[in-house]
Amino acid sequence: MLSSKNVVVVEAWNTTTTTQTQTPHRPSLLHPTFYWGYNCQVLFSGWPGSDRGMYALALIFVFFLAFLAEWLARCSDASSIKQGADKLAKVAFRTAMYTVKSGFSYLVILAVVSFNGGVFLAAIFGHALGFAVFRGRAFRNRDIQ
């Protein structure tokens, strides 16, 4: 039943007698735990590859994606829009900012799924600094008395 070319898998919950054939496991860049090396794949096939400079660029890119996601979250707040603006324009602006923020956030999630420890830390620090700068109380002028 077991050969070097294919593996026969029988599903335990399948009541019929059919089987599936699968190719043997191939090594890949996906890791089941955090990987702390610079040879990884983030967001795109083959990027950043095994170049340390490109890995540093990937970390900076993920950091700024997370940072900008926090800025866009602040832009989509109701308090960031002028009081006299048209209600439909307010809703359209907030919806557009929320949509772009969601796209950036999903890109950050996809980058973190690479299971690279550096990418994870870049995403966390980008979100933390972005929150502190754009939504934290420390940098708001109206909260300072």
Curated annotation (Swiss-Prot):
It is found in: Membrane. The chain crosses the membrane at residues 53-73, 106-126. GO terms for molecular function: copper ion transmembrane transporter activity. Highly expressed in roots and at lower levels in leaves, stems and flowers. Induction: Down-regulated by treatment with high concentrations of copper. Keywords: Copper, Copper transport, Ion transport, Membrane, Transmembrane, Transmembrane helix, Transport. Its main location: membrane. It is a multi-pass membrane protein. The keyword Transmembrane helix applies. One of its GO terms (cellular component) is membrane. Involved in the transport of copper. Belongs to the copper transporter (Ctr) (TC 1.A.56) family. SLC31A subfamily. This is Copper transporter 4. It comes from Arabidopsis thaliana (Mouse-ear cress). The gene is COPT4.
